[in-house]
């Protein structure tokens, strides 16, 4: 029997940050300020199963990234440096001077520039099936000749995805979520309610372009990340979580060379979409990560 997922919040709010409008939800009453950055091709709804598990521990800010969901779809500014600045400005506007940040997939790619741009604000980061483009072994994910996925190159091609996917958004997303290599192990983890939202977001005017621009920004991201890495590692505490049937810890080395303090963890019987497949296991890892961070910052 299909059951509808609980929305991440009853209220979607909108705030203008620079030249863009960011849609977001604020959920929870816990003492920890937490920024949750969803992956591709989803929206903030990807965190809906995490919310009830963390709401007593954290005050969660859950945006739709630029180009996704109810956020605006600007013509430019999809490089992760620009998106990181937008996300930090959102947290500042909401009164959060310091916060933890968690990112899945493309949301995780925002964490390194976020930590480098705002070192006094970002207290810890957690990469969920994600890493830092241009560093370590990260580029292998987009190379189909070494086991990577062809969709990286397809999504980066100007205009072609818009021409081919219009009217076929559901077909494409169904393939993305259920592909053999790193797709869902628990096939019903993304239920009809969530899937429909992701399809509608992609099918909205400018939705395909907005989603693809995150991939088209990768050459700029690679250049920016290498420049940031040359400045030295971030002192921010970092966690890397990989799924056994997903990308795994293939990008771990990119994080290890970029942060001073890195821990890692596996989640078993899980594909790429950890927040929707294994929310309880992920929530426990995040709580443990925050406790570890607090133990490091306690004065002797």
Feature map (PLM): residue ranges:
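A short, glycine- and basic residue-enriched loop/turn
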Residues: 43-44, 109, 271
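Surface-exposed alpha-helical interface segments used for non-catalytic interactions
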Residues: 45-48, 52, 85, 112, ...
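A short, highly charged, low-complexity intrinsically disordered segment
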Residues: 294-300
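Catalytic histidine-centered segment of alpha/beta-hydrolase-like enzymes
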Residues: 270-283
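Conserved HGGG/HGGXW glycine-rich cap/lid loop of the alpha/beta-hydrolase fold
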Residues: 26-70, 255
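Intrinsic disorder/low-complexity segments, especially N-terminal tails and targeting/processing regions
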Residues: 14, 19, 28-29, 300
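Flexible "cap/lid" subdomain of the alpha/beta-hydrolase fold that forms the substrate-access gate
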Residues: 2-14, 20-22, 33, 61, ...
